[in-house]
Amino acid sequence: MPAPTNTLLIEGTFTELADEFAQYIDALRKNEGSSLQSEISSLLEPLRQQEQSEEEPDRKQRDEVLKKLVAAAAVLNAAPEKEIISAYNLLVHLVHQASNPDMFLSRICTYLAKPITTSPQFGPTLAISILTTIFNTLTSSDSSRYHVLLAIVAVIRQSGSSYAFEALKPQLTAQLPTWLAAWELDEEEAQKLHLAVADAAQASGDFELAQSHVVQALQTIPANESSSKEARDLAVRALASALKSPAVFDFTSLTAADAIQALRTSDSSLFELLEIFTADTLDAYEDFVAATPLASISGGVLADAGEALQNKLRLLTLASIAASAPSRSLPYATIASALRVPTEDVEKWVIDTIRAGLVEGKLSQLRSEFLVHRATYRVFGEKQWAEVQGRLMVWRRSLENVLGVVRAERERFIRESLQAATEEANQGKSGEKGGKGGDRRRNPQHQQQQQQSQPSQPQQPRETELVAGAE
């Protein structure tokens, strides 16, 4: 798969390699028709003289030689399997010496996009290997890479190899936007590439990526061409695949496209169905289908999708009622009624909706209810803003009540603390005064005896024995 830029190292002058390549082509042709080597011999002679005299080569003369070599190179797809890669690498090396390699590389890519007849089993792998080499010999901003990438995608689509597509997928995800900007493609070229990637992704079973690139292709259509037949066909394809896809629940990118809006006139029934999936519920869908059979919509693009559409709208309906539930609690009976399913199947549909990422919550079998933690709004207009405002007002009143309770408790705590401290201080002062007065009343004679019993002579100091520490 495409990687950092590489360089082909092939020894020999242009004239030597061109003559060698012409001989190889003649050998593959098995002498059918004129000899390619003889056709280019007269063109190579002046170039050979320039090489010998070390003069600047005449690139226009080289271009004339390359025109004949590239025109005859279609036969390389019939070369022996072990020689195909080296033969194409030699041709690519010669083409890089042209005045404008792009005019030759695009044709080489068309050859490689066709089957390699001598290797039905490994032909796609060989072609992808050669194309990858070509891609990596070009600078990142070289628009020739566009044709090479188209050929790589075409080979992968024809082979149906999911392994090859998975190898290319990281490059498409990480690098494709940068490549498109560097190559400065026009709307038509960008659309062609996105559709090619979508076809390859679908052939490999990656329907989500396929849908993404179909939408990107749709967005390349200019507003003044949104009503053309080509735009209408692409819009119908994008919308039908989005409606049928089990992974697409957000239709914002589709409704924003001018070509989709143009379906309001050209395919009004299909556009009405889009509006139901965007904002309405299962009730509206069933009323619509009763009046407008799916087989009659836009040439029957949804004729075989009745069950898939109904199941998908059940998930969307559950998301809607979960988002609008004022108490965030949905009884099983309410869900069963909205989804037109038995009560015993409610948990299955809730789990499917959670897996789709439309809601989050907890099932309570004891209470037979679904506790909604989060729900996706399918549309967000005045009604939804009003719901948000109402919930914010409820939360505000609840917080104000909590704040009032906290403030009252804080004031009560401070008041009681001050009161307790004051009482404790008063009790301490009263106890201290009472204790001192009682002592004086109880022991006046004892105090007098203590004063009289004190010796009149001063006391002699006591001898103190000093103990020396061991040395």
Curated annotation (Swiss-Prot):
This is Eukaryotic translation initiation factor 3 subunit M. Disulfide bonds: none annotated. Component of the eukaryotic translation initiation factor 3 (eIF-3) complex, which is involved in protein synthesis of a specialized repertoire of mRNAs and, together with other initiation factors, stimulates binding of mRNA and methionyl-tRNAi to the 40S ribosome. The eIF-3 complex specifically targets and initiates translation of a subset of mRNAs involved in cell proliferation. Residues 445-461 have a biased composition (Low complexity). PROSITE patterns: PCI (PS50250). The keyword Signal does not apply. Residues 39-61, 419-471 are annotated as: Disordered. It comes from Aspergillus clavatus (strain ATCC 1007 / CBS 513.65 / DSM 816 / NCTC 3887 / NRRL 1 / QM 1276 / 107). GO terms for cellular component: eukaryotic 43S preinitiation complex; eukaryotic 48S preinitiation complex; eukaryotic translation initiation factor 3 complex, eIF3m. Keywords: Cytoplasm, Initiation factor, Protein biosynthesis. Its main location: cytoplasm. GO terms for molecular function: translation initiation factor activity. One of its GO terms (biological process) is formation of cytoplasmic translation initiation complex. Residues 430-442 have a biased composition (Basic and acidic residues). SUPFAM superfamilies: ARM repeat. Component of the eukaryotic translation initiation factor 3 (eIF-3) complex.
